[in-house]
Amino acid sequence: AKERKQGKSNNNKSQNGNADLIIEHADIRKSLLNMKSIIEGERALCFWLSQQTEVSLNHSDQKIKQDASDMVSLMTPVVKSLFSDLGMEITSDAMQIYGGYGYTKDQGIEQLYRDNRITPIYEGTNSVQAADLVFRKLSNKNGNIINKFLDLIKSETNSNNEKIKPFVKEFNNYLEILKKFSEWTIDRSETNRDCLLYTSDAADD
């Protein structure tokens, strides 16, 4: 993106007709920023889950150990499905940025895309992971685990971090939606499990 020149960006003010680097084009910048944001978010979540795994195995306090184990159990199907789906999205966007050249073997993007394509399939397909989340993990301990997770997130968003304050209100609204969804799912798990088949499809998406 910093080497290839093609077309004129919307901000091109030159009068000589020269093409711009493709990184100057708004859609390319948006794609690169989206990829960067996803990767950094995935890394943060992966590090946190790895830490919880260590705590669940080695902590001396049994309550802390069990709480960490609950978090690992809840988030494992989420992380597996989320990371593999987003991995496909990122490699697809990378190929798009390279253009037709990205479709060839020269740059290796097509190989990365092919390698990523297996990840939603193995270690339990993502639809199986979604069903596990909806049928078992959300209702585990009568929803206490998912509520603990949501409370943990809320405690972070309600901290005194000035950088995230502009986003806190909207983010908390999404947390409430997620909480209502989990409560609805737990209720249906007792009365109408068939409808949860459709819910698991939504969770997979």
Sequence positions of predicted segments:
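Long, well-ordered alpha-helical segments
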Residues: 1-18, 38-60, 83-98, 136-188
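Terminal amphipathic helices with adjacent charged low-complexity linkers/tails
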Residues: 13-14, 21-28
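Amphipathic alpha-helical segments
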Residues: 27, 31-33, 144-145
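DHp/HisKA dimerization-phosphoacceptor four-helix bundle of two-component histidine kinases
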Residues: 30, 34-37, 78-81, 173
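Alpha-helix capping/hinge segments and adjacent helical runs
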Residues: 48, 70-151
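Glycine-rich, mobile lid/loop segments that gate access to catalytic sites or pores
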Residues: 63-64
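Hydrophobic alpha-helical bundle architecture
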Residues: 192-196
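Conserved small/polar residues in nucleotide/adenosyl-binding loops
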Residues: 198-205
